[in-house]
Amino acid sequence: MRRVVSILLILSFGFVFVFPQTKQKPVSQFENVEPFSIGKGSSFSASVPRSNSDSSQTQAIPNGNISQDFSDALEFIRKNHVDGKNVNYNELTKSAIDSMLHTLDPHSNYFDADEYQDLLTDEQSEYYGIGATIANYQKGNETNTFIVATFPDSPAFRAGLRYGDKILAVNGETMADKNSSFVRDKVRGKKGSVVRLLVERAATKRQDTVDLKRNRVPQPTIPDAYIIREGIGYIDMSEGFNYTTAEELTVALSELHKQGMTSLILDLRENPGGILDQAVKVAEKFLPSGSTILSQRGRFSIDNRVWRSTNKTAETMPLAVLVNGSTASASEIVSGALQDYDRALVIGENTFGKGLVQSIIDLPYGSGLTLTTAKYYTPSGRSIQRDYSKSGLYDYFNHKVSLSEQNKTEAKTLTGRKVFGGDGITPDEIVTNSPLTNTQAKLLDPIFFFSSELANGNIQGFESYKIGGQIQYGKRIRPSDYPVTDEILKAFNNFLVQNGDWKSLSSNIEAENAFIKTRIRYNLITAAFGTVSANQVLIEEDKQMAKAVEV
């Protein structure tokens, strides 16, 4: 079965800005559209079902014997390769299909049955697990997986798992030196089933066996929304677009209006895309009825579509949109349309640049295929897809290749400003947040372990920083919440010196003073109030956010 998706955007002026359109009849996003995803990498959009028996469009596949060649080669490998008895032939076949698809473009992909199920689970905005954020940290030669945070009222929270607890085993299988994604997959399972964890408590170093019943774990796409300065609202939309995004945005806007919001910062950084129908509804919040949001053009006429807003009460307040290199696909549609209509000031770094639409094909035995079947364009006619013809997958996904200015396609916004296509969305205000230096990256491990000791009252002289009682999820933090003083910085330096593997890092304390203080406080706030509140700490040091507040 094949499926496809669509998109729309809205404007905050008293008239409609109509760009040249393709001649096909516009399609409302509310008419029989089965939403799926458009996203970065292995996310995509869905498509209207189309018959596979359209013989008028079908051509004979050249080299008809190639499939027999492949079968013969596989059999020859099985019989003759030195490791033939140990080869995973499913993986071998999967890699062959992937290579074939990636010859076409970077976003056509094959998913085996497990991967396909994970994909569908992610799109439903929920999974069955224990409700905890986990991460890998290294001390000495050992890498282990630790609890970083738990979700409100989740199985992990009710079982008393807390910041810094180490996961030693899952259902009797050791997790030492395992990647956190491997541990996550072991912890997840069928709803209502029981998973047994062996954990080492951060506070006491005691080992406990904990049985947790897996349950539905909601994954909101708007983890936070609050007044960042008087009159200025902030909405974090970093988690993509799923089936609940538009409803979440409606609730967030309503609450912020009640708190006196007169302007808004919409944060699309790190947003990988998602369900197109939801991205359309997000854009419609800010663009008026009749505004073209997106056009889609494909090989077949059925893939040619146009989406327009139907919102007659669009928001009219000043709007800033934050983007970066991980703002991809459906989130680029939102930011691109708002920019084309001069409805929002786009701030940050060039976006990812994914303008291809994938259709999903259900294959036998539970696997799935995504195939690029169309390209999408912003209201001004821009394609934001980056060139992939001269680069490999690594260079493409790591932004090693970009278009020169003279090769970008020029378009104009509603007020006549020049904008360019072919390399993502270029912000109106380019502001770059500095990436972690090598030294800062090396400091993350000891900062985590020190923070865990501090939060559990194990750092002498700083017992008052011990975090006890229930986690106060979603608290608006104040400067008085877990301030990191120079005395704590000295204690951290002693911690480095006493742990031989990190001793050499102590020479960087003075140069990295601000970074270390921010990260320790971030960890303490995470332990006390959860990750949503902790993100407020990082925002205080955010250059892009500062620019958005300024303008």
Q: What does each model-found stretch correspond to?
A:
Residues 330, 342, 349, 353-412:
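Polar, glycine-rich mid-to-C-terminal structural blocks
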Residues 78-145, 194-224, 538-549:
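Extended, small/polar residue-biased N-terminal targeting/export presequences
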Residues 47-58, 72-81, 231, 528-532:
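Acidic/histidine-rich, surface-exposed loop or edge segments in extracytoplasmic proteins
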Residues 1-4:
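Positively charged n-region of N-terminal signal peptides that target proteins for export
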Residues 61-66, 77-89, 146-162, 168-364, ...:
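Cleft-lining beta-strand/loop regions that shape enzyme active-site pockets
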Residues 8-16:
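Bacterial N-terminal signal peptides
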